[in-house]
């Protein structure tokens, strides 16, 4: 058999290559291997940090673009989500505020949804979603500074009908009164 005949047996035009399918397999394998080798806590920490780096980077980009360091919670949410339209389709369904926190109820269709949907060993709201948690919590921490003590994103449930995860974002207020800056005359 010559090389041409041999190559015909498995020839595949490059337009038929499915990179997302390969990514889904590698991503699922990575999550399972890290969990099996190092444990669940290490996996969650690693995935959070994978998201935190880009979260810090997008916050820095936003601050530079707006030439500001200070944003309100709802302003930061709107700016960040607008900047991330290529990766997320998020809709805010409810906003609640009390003395201690601001709570947003959201529908989130993210870039991880399709890979998770095709993997039997992955579920919505599972470990891989820590990438998003790290991303958003780090970005908001940078954009909101001292106004917020902590930001926490919680997966509530997967809504198959809406093809989105239902989540809440809690912004815990820093109720410590910040001293006004004084100027030396």
Residue ranges and their predicted role:
Residues 125-145:
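Active-site helix/loop of acyl-thioester processing domains in fatty-acid/polyketide metabolism
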Residues 1-103, 108-130, 148-185:
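N-terminal accessory segment detector
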């Amino acid at each position: 058999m010559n090389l041409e005949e041999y190559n015909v047996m498995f020839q595949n035009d490059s337009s038929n290559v499915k990179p997302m399918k390969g990514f889904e397999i590698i991503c699922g394998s990575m999550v399972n291997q890290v969990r099996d080798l190092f444990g669940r806590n290490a996996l969650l920490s690693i995935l959070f940090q994978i998201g935190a780096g880009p979260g810090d980077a997008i916050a820095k980009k936003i601050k530079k673009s707006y030439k500001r360091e200070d944003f309100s919670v709802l302003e930061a949410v709107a700016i960040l989500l607008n900047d991330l339209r290529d990766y997320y389709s998020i809709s805010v369904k409810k906003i609640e505020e009390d003395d201690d926190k601001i709570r947003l109820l959201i529908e989130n269709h993210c870039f991880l949804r399709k890979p998770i949907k095709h993997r039997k060993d992955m579920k919505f709201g599972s470990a891989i979603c820590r990438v998003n948690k790290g991303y958003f919590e780090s970005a908001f921490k940078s954009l909101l500074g001292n106004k917020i003590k902590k930001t926490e994103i919680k997966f509530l449930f997967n809504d198959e009908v809406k093809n989105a995860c239902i989540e809440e974002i809690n912004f815990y207020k820093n109720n410590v009164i910040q001293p006004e800056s004084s100027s030396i005359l």
